[in-house]
């Protein structure tokens, strides 16, 4: 059973060691984010030359190595893109497929080796260029990283938005066999959601990514979706009985650290998966 959690986007000093880890699940931390933008006061696109934009002081190479040494069920991934940087939207903005892929392979290989990472997650949410360009760039990138033995798993993080889905479904159609998990952002839906409605959305996304391991999700910030206190775990139990619960992911450790429920729901999710 797989549990995954995004970490590091909010620079509030959250550390890997703050997060409770159940030894009986596969546990993935996902660093948020690496972005192909310049790191400076006004970030601009770099055509595939990625830089770390997560809290590298608290989530450093030595801290990655330490948490993986402590728990042999922990792997660490990095998410590409994200919604915004410095208050501006992050765009997927390649000059050409081949130049973007070459730059991305070399810059990400460096980051992945430096930080002892195991996988990548694709979380672009705004796009310049058409779905086919996105499919080729990302598809070729993940194919090469896997073939070179740089990463052992890949996930994508779409949500229910027409433009987003058209890009990720184009990628899925051509390169779905290279993608191990679909981190579907169910928390982007409205928060006025019943368990039945959630299960309906889940089936809808399973059919959008046929054959994919669609993971369910909740957020610990104030965004939407089905919250733990409103029946999220009831929905999970139903999916588990049906053999459809491939895993759970959470946005985000940063928010949980600051919430009144400090990591309570992370523990609940992991014990449900481990049971």
UniProtKB/Swiss-Prot annotation:
Disulfide bonds: none annotated. It catalyses: Random endo-hydrolysis of N-acetyl-beta-D-glucosaminide (1->4)-beta-linkages in chitin and chitodextrins. Keywords: Carbohydrate metabolism, Chitin degradation, Chitin-binding, Glycosidase, Hydrolase, Polysaccharide degradation. The active site is at residue 125. Transmembrane segments: none annotated. InterPro entries: Chitinase-like, Glyco_hydro18_cat, Glyco_hydro_18_chit_AS, Glycoside_hydrolase_SF. GO terms for biological process: chitin catabolic process; polysaccharide catabolic process. The keyword DNA-binding does not apply. Residues 1-270 form the GH18 domain. Its EC number is 3.2.1.14. GO terms for molecular function: chitin binding; endochitinase activity. It is an enzyme of class 3 (hydrolase). PROSITE patterns: GH18_1, GH18_2. CDD domains: GH18_narbonin (cd06544). The keyword Transmembrane helix does not apply. Pfam families: Glyco_hydro_18. Belongs to the glycosyl hydrolase 18 family. Chitinase class II subfamily. Able to cleave glycolchitin. This is Chitinase 2. It comes from Tulipa saxatilis subsp. bakeri.
